Amino acid sequence: MNTEATQDHQEANTTGARLRHAREQLGLSQQAVAERLCLKVSTVRDIEDDKAPADLASTFLRGYIRSYARLVHIPEDELLPMMAKQAPIRAAKVAPMQSFSLGKRRKKRDGWLMSFTWLVLFVVIGLSGAWWWQDHKAQQEEISTMADQSSAELNGGDANSQNVPLDTSAPAAPTADSAANSAPTDTASAPTTSAPAQTPADNNAVVAPSQANVDTAGTTPAAPATTPASPLPTDQANVTTPAASAQDLVMNFSADCWLEVSDATGKKLFSGLQRKGGNLNLSGQAPYKLKIGAPAAVQIQYLGKPVDLSRFIRTNQVARLTLNAESSPAQ
């Protein structure tokens, strides 16, 4: 008898047994308690059997027990000592482990995201650097090619300038010929002046009229020899005053600049290096195609209007333009 009483007293000292005893006194079933508390029947059964569900936190379990106690009219002060013996042990073991695992999982996820972010950032920086290097290298190669072409053309221009004096010596021959032609004219005119002198000396001579005729005939061809010289000033004036073209292209240079200009026929109007302070006035058949090594060093006027080169100056690139009378300058 004493053993059975001791067992009943121990069972009554547990939280689950105390709640079951109070429920049975009120005549409630586990299903009714579960419906009123909005819990599962299995959860109510675990509470009465003093079992803690593995998927249920200790905080929620304490809340369910308190709600159950209020339902069966058991004071919380009576259940607190019993809950203190059961819940703290489980809370001390489970709660820290759960928070540690969550923190470890979150830290692992954050570390993976951070690694991926750094990888993407490095890839973007690498691609940007490679693109900039290729563009810079291409510009340097193009500028060096232009410089080589310019130096080659300058060397060719120097060779041609050395041959110019040989060509200018040719007009000296016509000058000598003209001097030779003028000599007979002078000699022919000499008898005309001497003829009047001989006439008074030989007044009675019959030959005097015939000599006068001969001298007159000698003076007659002398006039055509001098007449072709008169048109020369007129031809020289025509050469020095050429007619201005409506398609003039004017360029002023504020620094050394490599330049290449060609017209619609493909003829190169200019190709070479222009020095600081120089200017060019070109005319040809539109449209013009321009290639400028240093756009910031040149100012262009086409048909009296300035050409905008600001987009090439900002990017510091070689300017390639097509100038047309009907359209605005295009790259």
From Swiss-Prot:
GO terms for cellular component: plasma membrane. Residues 146-238 are annotated as: Disordered. Keywords: Cell inner membrane, Cell membrane, Cell shape, DNA-binding, Membrane, Signal-anchor, Transmembrane, Transmembrane helix. The chain crosses the membrane at residues 112-132. Residues 30-49 bind DNA. It comes from the Bacteria. Its main location: membrane. Residues 133-331 are periplasmic. It is found in: Cell inner membrane. GO terms for molecular function: DNA binding. Gene3D superfamilies: lambda repressor-like DNA-binding domains. The helix-turn-helix (HTH) motif in the cytoplasmic domain of the N-terminus is involved in the formation of spirals to maintain the rigid rod shape. As this protein is anchored in the cytoplasmic membrane, the HTH motif may contribute to protein-protein interactions to form the RodZ helix, which is localized beneath the cytoplasmic membrane. The C-terminal domain may be critical for determination of the rod shape by probably interacting with enzymes required for synthesis of the peptidoglycan layer, including PBPs in the periplasm. NCBIfam families: PRK10856.1. This is Cytoskeleton protein RodZ. It comes from Klebsiella pneumoniae subsp. pneumoniae (strain ATCC 700721 / MGH 78578). The lineage of its organism: Bacteria, Pseudomonadati, Pseudomonadota, Gammaproteobacteria, Enterobacterales.
